[in-house]
Amino acid sequence: MDIIFEISDLKIKCKALNNKTAEKLIKLMPIEAKIATWGNEIYFDTPNNDIVLENDAKEVFNLGEIAFWNQGSAIAIGFGKTPASKKDEIRLISKANHWANTYKPEDLKKLKAFKDGEPIKVSILNK
């Protein structure tokens, strides 16, 4: 299933994976929140949910992979180094579930232009 992240005039199209995290987040959509930044990462709160760490949860993500950070109940999108990174990796503060991939990973680098408090919306892309 395709989803879209909208922040200001930037639209990022993604493909949800076939896992429990994606399934639960899709049921909550549309999700509207205000972003926070942490190095080259944005994250934002999601509504109450019961999402748990999946067996393949990880700390290091590739450009284009979308995470759900369980400890913060937040969607996290890394696009470069964070304060936890070693060298040039995209490292979250703790393990997170990989639940979606962007179609154009390089588009995530445009997130650098956004600041704390800016609104974001995540929704299912119309078929």
Regions found by a protein language model. Name each.
Residues 2-7:
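A short beta-strand micro-motif
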Residues 10-14:
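Short beta-strand segments
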Residues 17-24, 28-127:
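Glycine-rich active-site loops that engage anionic ligands at enzyme catalytic sites
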